[in-house]
Design a protein with these regions (language model features):
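Surface-exposed, interaction-prone regions used to assemble/regulate multi-protein complexes
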Residues: 1-135
């Protein structure tokens, strides 16, 4: 199996094996990261500000609507996705094979992110909605 879910009361931690970022889609108000393996896929949409920790250790605050500043995200294409972690209070963290990561907190005004899995990741379905605990 290419994925394992580790559940606790406060978080769901999905460990992914052999998953790579196959597409990065940019539109006017969000970015979409698509990951794929032979057994499953995940579609992750980020529609509010998030923090990107680069492999070099540098940190970038990224606003998806500010397309001129999305350049660091381009380096994600082709990287392995090591894990997807969602907390009960609505924080999403993605960890990549080069040591970089993305962390998206809930936004008080709008849906800030969503995750949808397919194949063996069918149970991976979360949405970072304002003011809502996820489980």
């Amino acid at each position: 199996m290419n994925a394992q879910l580790i559940e606790s009361d406060d978080e769901h931690h999905w460990v992914l094996l052999d998953h790579r970022v196959t597409q990065l889609v940019i539109d006017r108000s969000s970015i979409r990261i698509q990951t794929w393996s032979l057994d499953g896929s995940a579609d992750i949409r980020l529609a509010a500000a998030f923090t990107m920790q680069l492999a070099s250790g540098a940190t970038r605050h990224v606003e998806p609507a500010d397309t001129e500043r999305l350049a660091p995200c381009l380096a994600l294409v082709g990287l392995g996705v090591r894990s997807v972690t969602v907390t009960r209070n609505g924080t999403l963290t993605l960890a990549f094979s080069d040591g970089s990561s993305i962390s998206a907190s809930p936004d008080v005004r709008r849906s800030s992110w969503d995750v949808q899995g397919g194949g063996i990741l069918e149970g991976m379905a979360y949405a970072g909605e304002p003011g809502i605990e996820l489980w």
